[in-house]
Amino acid sequence: MADLDDIKDGKDFHTDKPQTNTLFALKGCGALDWGMQSRLARIFNPKTRKTVMLAFDHGYFQGPTTGLERIDINIAPLFEYADVLMCTRGILRSVVPPAINKPVVLRASGANSILTELSNEAVAVAMDDAVRLNSCAAAAQVYIGSEHEHQSIKNIIQLIDAGLRVGMPIMAVTGVGKDMARDQRYFSLATRIAAEMGAQIIKTYYVDKGFERIAAGCPVPIVIAGGKKLLEREALEMCYQAIDQGASGVDMGRNIFQSEDPVAMIKAVHAVVHHNETAERAYELFLSEKG
């Protein structure tokens, strides 16, 4: 039985002050459950509402591509500088130290390779395994306009439904159908469809003309893919323009880990995303940090 002899009656209830609720003001997340908002708050810095994701999931269809031959040697030194790690469960379990304590966006689609039709994907991770791995989100490709468009949308819907049951955000990644142009109209279509299906984050490509319309027409946060390797100055300019036009962050791989100095590059990207540095100033930072 509890000892009640020394219990004191509470008196300081501040009855003159109504309870306040602190909102996490991330685009499109106001109606989400607490657990999902909590995961999103680990992905997106609550102060800047931006993120720098380090993508090294390419091996799920490309194999050991340049820069990813040895994750433990080439990629692990970058972990501490990233806000979020994006990888497959195989790499997460075999290479990523649990003590690194970084939020993970788990690649959850697969079953294809560069030798076959890329859009022919399936859900490759059960949601209970994503939870078991303490993931903060799961990601899958959606191929609007491709041969397997219907299946890729079904994959996203399946993951979204499973994610809602456990409070797991889903990031839809817009793969490009082979007959579709990489322009504002296509990415406005693809990002909006994925958001309408219920994805909480969209990963897409930056385009020079009309990106602000893509971002404005998407009701949830957009992060841009790095895409093919660019010169460092060009990659930083792309980052700056995307953030300036409404992106909520970047999910970069090759433009970081294939850089002349990956650590210096991710620091420069961080400066653009979280501190609103121009591409020019970020490039100066890259040069000063370069080993």
From Swiss-Prot:
GO terms for molecular function: acyltransferase activity, transferring groups other than amino-acyl groups; fructose-bisphosphate aldolase activity. Homodecamer. CDD domains: DhnA. Involved in the degradation of phospho-AI-2, thereby terminating induction of the lsr operon and closing the AI-2 signaling cycle. Catalyzes the transfer of an acetyl moiety from 3-hydroxy-5-phosphonooxypentane-2,4-dione to CoA to form glycerone phosphate and acetyl-CoA. It catalyses: dihydroxyacetone phosphate + acetyl-CoA = 3-hydroxy-2,4-dioxopentyl phosphate + CoA. PANTHER family: 3-HYDROXY-5-PHOSPHONOOXYPENTANE-2,4-DIONE THIOLASE (PTHR47916:SF1), FRUCTOSE-BISPHOSPHATE ALDOLASE CLASS 1 (PTHR47916). It is an enzyme of class 2 (transferase). Its EC number is 2.3.1.245. It comes from Salmonella paratyphi B (strain ATCC BAA-1250 / SPB7). It is found in: Cytoplasm. Keywords: Cytoplasm, Schiff base, Transferase. Pfam families: DeoC (PF01791). This is 3-hydroxy-5-phosphonooxypentane-2,4-dione thiolase. The active site is at K203. Its main location: cytoplasm. GO terms for cellular component: cytoplasm. Belongs to the DeoC/FbaB aldolase family.
